[in-house]
Regions:
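Sequence/structural signature of beta-propeller domains
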Residues: 1-260
Length: 260
């Protein structure tokens, strides 16, 4: 496993998002556990997606998979408008877009017209309906890659009242980092199956990351909103290999005022 995200379900169990690797030996999956960490079940992506991933020669972004997971109760526009509030769904942030060269898979990837095959302009927010054991997805349009970066992707998704917050970021650190964003979008953005640039409300994390005049990490990684409405962000320290090992834990205040 490579746990990258965690959320609490209404029944008190935990769901973890585990990121897969490019080879497919470690698949992207959701893992449900009890409060003691005992695994209750594991869920992988649909077989046709896994088959396309296993046969494609375009593997550059396939190692950037499940990064965050959150729970949302129904109804959800465009996904489950019929669902009642007792029905819950898991929404999973896929870090970067995947492109398939496999015959027959073109319309299953994130760049079906091969506009930017090496680094698709869109990624996905997967939606898993546990009761039906069905997957759906919503496309998420990523910002343009800055000149000094290799890619832009997502690294978290968190449920808030009436919408969601994701982290969208580039892969550069220090003075080279340009996109370190919290992005809020409302439930209505899901209705047409794509979160567009116009539907994003952005909070720039760079001033907060730079407030101590230290090195700016490339990886804001986790977001949580407390019952009192306080929003927290944590960075990934990436251990100490080619990195200082620092972790930043940011308290950004009330969520309600961040995107005004």
């Amino acid at each position: 496993l490579d746990p990258e995200g965690i959320t609490v379900a209404p029944d008190g169990t935990y769901w973890l998002a585990s990121e897969g690797d490019a080879s497919g030996e470690r698949p992207n999956r959701l893992v449900q556990t009890d409060t003691l960490g005992n695994v209750l079940q594991e869920v992988t992506l649909p077989k046709r997606i896994e088959k396309c991933r296993s046969k494609t020669t375009s593997v550059g972004s396939l190692g950037s998979g499940f990064e965050g997971v959150t729970v949302a109760q129904g109804p959800l526009p465009g996904i489950a408008p019929w669902a009642g509030p007792r029905r819950y769904f898991l929404l999973v942030a896929q870090q970067r877009g995947w492109n398939y060269t496999t015959p027959g898979c073109r319309w299953l990837d994130d760049d079906p017209f091969d506009l930017n095959a090496d680094e698709p302009f869109a990624t996905r927010i997967w939606v898993y309906d546990m009761k039906r054991d069905k997957w759906k997805h919503v496309f998420y349009l990523l910002e343009s890659v800055p000149s000094d970066a290799s890619w832009v992707g997502l690294s978290e998704i968190t449920r808030v009242e009436g919408g969601f917050v994701v982290i969208e970021r580039d892969n550069r650190s220090g003075d080279f980092g340009e996109i370190k964003w919290l992005v809020h979008f409302s439930d209505s953005a899901l209705a047409d199956g794509i979160v567009t640039h116009a539907e994003k409300e952005v909070y720039d994390l760079l001033p907060d990351l730079n407030a101590t005049n230290g090195w700016i990490t490339d990886k804001p990684e986790g977001v949580a909103v407390t019952p009192a409405g306080e929003l927290y962000v944590v960075t990934d320290n990436d251990g100490v290999e080619d990195w200082s090992g620092e972790t930043r834990f940011l308290r950004l205040g009330k969520f309600a005022g961040l995107f005004d």
